[in-house]
């Protein structure tokens, strides 16, 4: 099962966060990082990172920029908005060239071993349908906005139609912040 989280890294005193789908397996985590992303570049050389289990809206925010309220455990950044953060040491990096409908890309398959967990006192909010739709828009946005990913026109049209459909539902059922984040992504893609 893929779990949607926010991964945080630090390199040259700069914090980075990215929404990433990860696989949890006992005390280990596995993630696939695409060449060209800041997280990929950071974890080529950095050996520590955190996986932040956060509200869905924080996953969408993470696709837009790195600004956030960071806390630190042994200089490893994690998010103040997390329900909990898990800290990992990289134990393996594998590199593969992958070709799919998004084109050719270099992929780092990274495995980390858990070294610490911190639970924060953030109380979960009730789930809203806009939460899941906003995460889906963020996933599609991350692909459409990445200049390293080549998408054929038919797939691109389908993705844009999906974003518009999800946005129409968010406008009906979501809160102000859901709508604002979705609007930013649509504007960045010149869809508004």
Swiss-Prot record:
Gene3D superfamilies the UniProt entry points to: Electron Transport, Fmn-binding Protein, Chain A, Hypothetical membrane protein ta0354_69_121
InterPro entries the record matches: DUF447_C, DUF447_N, Split_barrel_FMN-bd, UCP018747
Domain of life: Archaea
Family: To M.thermoautotrophicum MTH863.
Protein name stated in the entry: Uncharacterized protein MJ1453
């Amino acid at each position: 099962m893929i779990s949607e989280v926010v991964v945080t890294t630090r390199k040259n005193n700069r914090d980075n966060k990215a929404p990433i789908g990860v696989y949890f397996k006992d005390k280990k985590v596995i993630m696939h990082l695409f060449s060209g992303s800041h997280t990929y570049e950071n974890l080529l050389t950095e050996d520590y990172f955190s996986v932040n289990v956060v509200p869905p809206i924080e996953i969408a925010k993470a696709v837009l920029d790195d600004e956030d309220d960071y806390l630190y455990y042994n200089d490893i950044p994690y998010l103040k908005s997390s329900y909990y953060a898990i800290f990992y040491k990289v134990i393996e990096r594998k590199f593969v060239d992958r070709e799919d409908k998004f084109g050719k890309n270099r992929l780092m398959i990274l495995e980390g071993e858990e070294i610490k967990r911190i639970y924060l006192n953030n109380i979960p909010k009730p789930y809203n349908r806009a939460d899941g739709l906003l995460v889906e828009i963020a996933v599609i946005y991350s692909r459409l906005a990445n200049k390293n990913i080549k998408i054929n026109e038919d797939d691109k049209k389908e993705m844009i139609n999906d974003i518009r459909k999800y946005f129409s539902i968010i406008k009906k059922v979501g809160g102000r912040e859901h709508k604002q984040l979705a609007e930013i992504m649509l504007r960045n893609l010149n869809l508004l």
